[in-house]
Design a protein with these regions (language model features):
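A charged, aromatic-enriched C-terminal amphipathic alpha-helix characteristic of glycosyltransferases
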Residues: 354, 358, 368-402
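A short helix/loop element that forms part of the nucleotide-sugar donor recognition site in Leloir-type
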Residues: 48-50, 203-219, 372
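N-terminal subdomain of nucleotide-sugar transferases
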Residues: 1-50, 54-57, 245-248, 410
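Nucleotide-activated donor-binding/catalytic signature segment of Leloir-type glycosyltransferases, i.e.
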Residues: 251, 259-260, 265-292
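Membrane-proximal helix-turn-helix segments that form the acceptor-binding/catalytic region
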Residues: 109-112, 116-120, 148-169
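Conserved donor-binding/catalytic core segment of Leloir-type glycosyltransferases
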Residues: 220-236, 242-245, 378
Length: 410
């Protein structure tokens, strides 16, 4: 098959790992021809480019800044990107007959591209629903439900759902949310297809190497290390992380490692500079291999979500924690099911964002846990990953929706 993938995440190689890289690599491994369109943002100061890696073609097309920029430019970029991507399809891939078009949210503004490819080629369309916009912006007080902007984007959201032949949601709570808030949608085309990766074989790190990595990164040898890694933005509700660090500063059993980048990084760095916490360390975003090395010496992975969310987020940062056998501590709003799923699979604990007493209890529970029980949580984490979040499973779910498993000649 010829498969078109539209994404806001810049992809110019499949040699690195990530949820979209891994999924495209899985499709490629089955012999499909892959065409990926993704941005080259204005801040990179580079022109559009087309490159090839085996049976995978990468069109990195110049756009406005989309990621980690101010809300005004992000808004203009979101509005203009479907026109930019559509020009890219017409200019670079006009001679390709696509069988399937895959796309993820954000953004919700790919409708014209999808419609063009479906009408031209009779292609099937599959939405990987990773974000529910504009409601997430309403939750974060970035727009009002009564305003023109919300109504405009809500219409765009409806159009995207309507044009999608199938919609893959990250979790059951995601699916139920879509049903409840979009009653006209055909329920048969909405299914659960969670974030997924191709995990690496797990190898335990020796005590000697573990100590060396800790020393290199200024981490304590004799404390449980709780890592928060990933985006540092408003949706993560990181004030609760800072409150947690402050509330446990005198506890000798635990240490917090915060690794990432995002719109809130400068504010968090300022807080670290002003408060100089002795039980925590902040590191700017790292290359994936360096970040993976750090995770090998950490004990518990942390997930934070803003308390005001009404949409059920399911952050992909869960997957690398599980890959490295880290038990998970989730601090989230009451509408997501990520915490209940972690507890159901016995690989961690969940608390409501803002409940500092329950947070301290969960932290103490990890620190005081017997080694045998903690090891069981670690094994449960890896099992949870391998049973639910493999790209091979995501691939089969997509192919099954269109009954394409045995029809690669399309």
């Amino acid at each position: 098959m010829n498969i078109l993938f539209l994404t806001l995440l810049k992809i110019d190689t499949l040699e690195i790992r990530g949820i979209y890289h891994d999924l495209m690599r899985e499709f490629s491994s089955h012999g499909h021809k892959i065409y990926i369109i993704s941005p080259t943002e204005r801040k990179e100061n580079k022109p559009s480019s087309l490159s090839t890696e085996g049976n995978v073609h990468f069109l990195n097309i110049r756009t406005l800044n989309v990621q980690k920029t101010n809300i005004i430019e992000k808004g203009f970029a979101t509005l203009s990107i479907e026109h930019v991507f559509l020009r890219g399809v017409k200019k670079y891939f006009s001679d390709v007959k696509f069988d399937l078009v895959l796309y993820s949210t954000p953004p919700i503004t790919f409708t014209k591209v999808i419609d063009y490819v479906k009408n031209k080629d009779g292609a099937k369309s599959y939405l990987l629903l990773k974000d529910i916009f504009p409601q997430n912006a309403v939750d974060m007080k970035m727009m009002s439900k009564n305003g023109f902007i919300y109504k405009f984007f809500r219409k765009k959201e409806h159009q995207l759902y309507k044009i999608s032949d199938q919609i893959g949601c990250m979790s059951e709570a995601n699916r139920q949310y879509i049903y409840t808030h979009n009653p006209k949608i055909n329920r048969e085309k909405v299914s659960v297809n969670p974030n997924s990766i191709q995990p690496q074989p797990f190898e335990e790190i020796s005590a000697e190497n573990k100590a060396a990595i800790k020393k290199k990164n200024g981490l304590p040898i004799d404390k449980k290390i709780f890592i928060y890694g990933g985006n540092l933005g408003i949706p993560q509700g990181l004030d609760f992380l800072l409150e947690t660090i402050s509330a446990t500063e005198k506890d000798p059993k635990m240490f917090f490692l915060v690794v990432g980048s995002g719109t809130e990084f400068d504010r968090i760095q300022k807080w670290f500079n002003q408060n100089n916490p002795q039980n925590a360390k902040l590191i700017s975003g790292l290359p994936k291999q360096d970040y993976d090395d750090l995770m090998k010496v950490c004990d518990v992975g942390m997930i934070f979500l803003h308390k005001d969310f009404t949409i059920p987020n399911f952050p992909s940062r869960l997957l690398p924690y599980l890959e490295y056998k880290l038990p998970v501590l989730v601090a989230a709003d009451p509408n997501t099911d990520i915490g209940t799923e972690v507890e159901k699979h016995n690989c961690g604990f969940a608390v409501l964002t803002g409940d500092i007493e329950k947070m301290k209890f969960a932290l103490d529970s990890f620190c005081n846990m017997e080694d045998e029980k903690f090891e069981k949580l670690r094994n449960n984490s890896r099992n949870y990953l391998e049973e639910n979040f493999l790209v091979s499973q995501s691939y089969q779910l997509i192919m099954k929706q269109f009954d394409l498993q045995n029809n690669n000649s399309l």
